[in-house]
């Protein structure tokens, strides 16, 4: 985008719903409550009473898989599994973890995020900026520690003398073992799941996200060296299309993978 035509910084100033990109935090909460990567859970039709009405979440592909593992539920981004997890674990626990990861959740009011749909499927009231979502994923990439984003690491003068150092705060959000297991699960998103188009050909982990009406598409991912987020969307929040084709999170993943390959050209491959 041309800054002269539009000075809006979409990385830091525009909030959009994260969709399924919120799910790793739900699954992390599940691990903390005793679930394991191979724990069985049934992908089936479920109904919940929400604001006096029955709500039945749908899977993006319209099918039900029966009994699957927790990992498969994340890798294939199964909505019914995410909703069941929030309902079982408890809205308050998932809400707290999302807040600790840095998501700007709305706690009260007519519209708030203390509900199954906002927490399980990412239909957040205010949404998130790409920077906020990237920062939330640092809890997975940094073994449970959330890193505060900084615009610079150091400032030097013309002679190389240090003038100022960027302060990067960090705090523990997840136990080390939870972050480790989440990374292993999220690696499979890129090798056999919804993010396979973004596989950069080296160890990487991440998650896709798409919102209702195909108005926003996300991919948030990381390697041992770098974490990056791709957001696709229009300023008027209209559906994503290009050349008559619908764009989705697969396209976001593909762009992410291309960036990672270029950014890490010549960097030795290493595992998590």
Please name every model-derived segment.
Residues 54-59, 90-135, 148-151:
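Mid-domain, small-residue-enriched loop/turn segments at the edges of structured enzyme/sensor domains
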Residues 1-12, 17, 22, 72-76, ...:
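A penicillin-recognizing enzyme superfamily signal
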Residues 29-34, 88, 100, 139-143, ...:
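Active-site catalytic microenvironments for nucleophilic, acid-base chemistry
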Residues 13, 80-82, 116-118:
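Short, solvent-exposed beta-strand edge segments and adjacent coil->beta transition regions
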Residues 84-85, 123, 206-208:
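Thr-Gly-centered strand-to-loop micro-motif
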């Amino acid at each position: 985008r041309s800054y002269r035509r539009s000075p809006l910084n979409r990385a830091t100033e525009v909030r959009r719903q994260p969709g399924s990109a919120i799910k790793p935090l739900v699954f992390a909460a599940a691990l903390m409550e005793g679930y394991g990567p191979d724990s069985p859970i049934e992908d089936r039709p479920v109904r919940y009473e929400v604001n006096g009405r029955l709500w039945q979440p749908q899977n993006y592909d319209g099918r039900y898989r029966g009994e699957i593992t927790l990992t498969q539920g994340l890798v294939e981004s199964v909505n019914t599994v995410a909703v069941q997890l929030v309902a079982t674990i408890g809205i308050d626990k998932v809400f707290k973890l999302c807040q600790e990861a840095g998501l700007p959740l709305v706690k009260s009011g007519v519209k708030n995020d203390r509900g199954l749909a906002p927490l399980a499927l990412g239909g957040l009231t205010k949404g998130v900026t790409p920077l906020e979502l990237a920062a939330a994923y640092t809890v997975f990439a940094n073994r449970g520690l959330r890193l505060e984003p900084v615009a610079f690491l150091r400032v030097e003068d013309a002679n190389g003398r240090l003038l100022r150092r960027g302060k990067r705060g960090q705090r523990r959000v997840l136990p080390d073992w939870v972050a480790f297991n989440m990374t292993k699960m999220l690696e499979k998103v890129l090798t056999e799941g919804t993010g396979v188009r973004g596989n950069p050909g080296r160890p990487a982990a991440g998650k896709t996200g798409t919102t209702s009406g195909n108005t926003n598409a996300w991919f948030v991912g990381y390697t041992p060296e770098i974490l990056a987020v791709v957001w696709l969307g229009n300023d008027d929040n209209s559906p994503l299309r290009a050349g008559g084709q619908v764009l989705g999170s697969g396209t976001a993943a593909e762009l992410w993978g291309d960036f990672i390959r270029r950014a890490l050209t010549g960097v030795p491959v290493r595992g998590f």
